Amino acid sequence: FPIPLPFCWLCRTLIKRIQAVVPKGVLLKAVAQVCHVVPLPVGGICQCLAERYIVICLNMLLDRTLPQLVCGLVLRCSS
């Protein structure tokens, strides 16, 4: 059964507020740290991919997808 609309609105609003507080630079550094943990040949590839594509992916995910995806999965909210 779907969750009432006010809860879905509250969920999306809350996630957007959290996104506003957590700078994207912090997330980029966290991804870069993961690349340092993996073995060297893969780590170099990981670092290269992170530098080129993580900004694009984070912008897309955080700005558009994340609130609707999380609230849809957790609360079964429609888009």
Curated annotation (Swiss-Prot):
Q: Name one GO cellular component term.
A: extracellular region
Any one GO BP annotation for this protein? respiratory gaseous exchange by respiratory system
Keyword hit for Secreted: yes
Q: Where in this chain does the record put each Saposin B-type domain?
A: 4-79
Residue pairs linked by disulfide bridges in the UniProt entry: 8-77, 11-71, 35-46
Q: Does the keyword Transmembrane apply?
A: no
PROSITE patterns linked to this entry = SAP_B (PS50015)
Where does it reside? Secreted, Extracellular space, Surface film
What highest taxon heads this organism's lineage? Eukaryota
Known function: Pulmonary surfactant-associated proteins promote alveolar stability by lowering the surface tension at the air-liquid interface in the peripheral air spaces. SP-B increases the collapse pressure of palmitic acid to nearly 70 millinewtons per meter.
Protein name (database record): Pulmonary surfactant-associated protein B
The gene from which this protein is expressed is SFTPB
